[in-house]
C-alpha cells in the first residue's frame, strides 16, 4: 500500500508557489528526506527513490514548481502499484513533458524527445524498437502538453496528428491500443527486470535463467511492481553474502543515519544534504534524463570518503 503524500504538501503550503526556487526546492527536499529517514516502511522509500531516478526530471532545468510537485506526488503514489499504469501516466506528466520539450511538439513537426526516452529509458531499452516506432509515437503524443497557467496536463487536439500510427509492425489509433501493443512486445518487462536486479542483487547482468524467471513472474502478475520486487527478493543470489552493490551518497548517508539511530538532523536535513551534494548527488537535480549513475561510477572523483574520514557529517549518535 502506497504511503500518502500529504507530508509533501506541507512543504508546498509552507513555501507556496511564489517563493524563490531555492526555498521551494529545499522545502521539498526536507520533507522527502524526513520520510526517508524516519518512515516505518523504508522499503517503500527505496522504491520511491528507484522510480524517482527511473522517471528522472531535473527541477533546475525549467523550475515549474507546481508541475514538479505533481511529478513527485505521481512518483510516490505509483511506486508500489502497476508498471503499465506508471508508463501510461508518465506521457501525461507535466514535468516530464516540459523537461523533454514535448510542449513544443506539433503534428507537422513532432519533437521526438519524449517518445525516444519513453522507449529507450522507461519501457523497452535499446535494441528493442526501430526509429520508425519513435517517429510514430512522437506524432501520436504531439498534442500532450501543459497548461502554463495551472501547470497541469492539457491535450491540444490541434497539435495532434489524426493519422494512423504503427508500433513494432502493428497499427494503433489511441493510447489504449498502443499500450496493448507495447504490453505484447516479446521483450516488454526485461528492461525493468534488469534494473531491479541491478538495484537489489548485483551490478552484473542477471543470468538468462534469473532474467527469464523475473520476467515470467512479472508478466503473470500483470506487471504489478510489488510482485517484481517479490520475485527479485526470491532469487538465490539476493541472499548470497558478497559485496555486489555500491551505495549512492543518498543511500550511504541516510542508510547510515537509520542504522546508527542518528538524532542530529535539523528540520531541513541541511547537514546531510550538504554532505550528500558535496559527494556528487543533488536530490531532484539529476545530471540528465538517464538519472543518477549507479555502481562503480560513484567511486570515481568523489568527496564521499573524504567527507566521512574528516568527520564533516558531525553526527551525534544516541
Segments predicted by a language model, with ranges:
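Stable alpha-helical elements in mature extracytoplasmic
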Residues: 29, 43-47, 67, 71, ...
Amino acid at each position: 500500500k502506497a504511503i500518502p503524500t500529504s507530508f509533501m504538501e506541507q512543504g508546498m503550503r509552507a513555501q507556496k508557489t511564489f517563493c524563490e526556487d531555492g526555498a521551494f526546492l529545499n522545502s521539498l527536499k526536507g520533507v522527502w528526506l524526513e520520510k526517508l529517514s524516519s518512515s516505518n516502511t523504508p522499503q517503500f522509500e527505496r522504491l520511491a527513490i528507484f522510480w524517482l531516478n527511473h522517471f528522472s526530471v531535473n527541477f533546475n532545468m525549467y523550475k515549474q514548481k507546481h508541475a514538479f510537485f505533481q511529478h513527485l506526488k505521481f512518483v510516490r503514489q505509483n511506486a508500489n502499484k502497476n508498471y503499465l499504469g506508471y508508463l501510461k501516466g508518465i506521457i501525461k506528466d507535466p514535468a516530464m513533458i516540459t523537461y523533454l520539450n514535448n510542449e513544443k511538439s506539433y503534428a507537422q513537426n513532432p519533437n521526438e524527445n519524449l517518445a525516444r526516452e519513453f522507449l529507450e529509458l522507461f519501457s523497452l531499452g535499446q535494441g528493442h524498437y526501430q526509429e520508425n516506432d519513435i517517429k510514430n509515437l512522437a506524432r501520436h503524443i504531439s498534442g500532450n502538453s501543459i497548461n502554463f497557467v495551472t501547470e497541469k496536463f492539457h491535450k491540444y487536439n490541434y497539435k495532434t496528428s489524426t493519422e494512423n500510427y504503427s508500433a513494432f509492425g502493428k497499427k494503433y489509433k489511441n493510447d489504449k491500443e498502443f499500450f496493448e501493443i507495447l504490453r505484447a512486445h516479446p521483450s516488454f518487462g526485461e528492461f525493468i527486470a534488469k534494473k531491479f536486479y541491478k538495484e537489489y542483487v548485483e551490478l552484473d547482468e542477471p543470468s538468462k535463467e534469473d532474467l527469464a524467471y523475473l520476467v515470467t513472474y512479472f508478466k503473470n502478475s500483470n506487471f504489478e511492481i510489488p510482485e517484481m520486487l517479490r520475485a527479485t527478493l526470491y532469487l538465490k543470489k539476493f541472499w548470497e553474502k558478497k559485496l555486489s552493490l555500491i551505495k549512492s551518497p543518498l543511500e550511504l548517508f541516510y542508510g547510515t543515519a537509520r542504522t546508527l539511530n542518528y538524532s542530529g538532523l535539523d528540520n531541513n536535513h541541511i547537514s546531510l544534504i550538504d554532505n550528500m551534494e558535496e559527494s556528487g548527488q543533488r536530490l531532484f537535480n539529476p545530471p540528465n534524463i538517464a538519472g543518477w549513475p549507479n555502481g562503480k561510477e560513484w567511486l570515481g572523483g568523489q568527496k564521499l570518503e573524504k567527507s566521512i574520514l574528516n568527520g564533516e557529517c558531525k553526527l551525534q549518535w544516541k
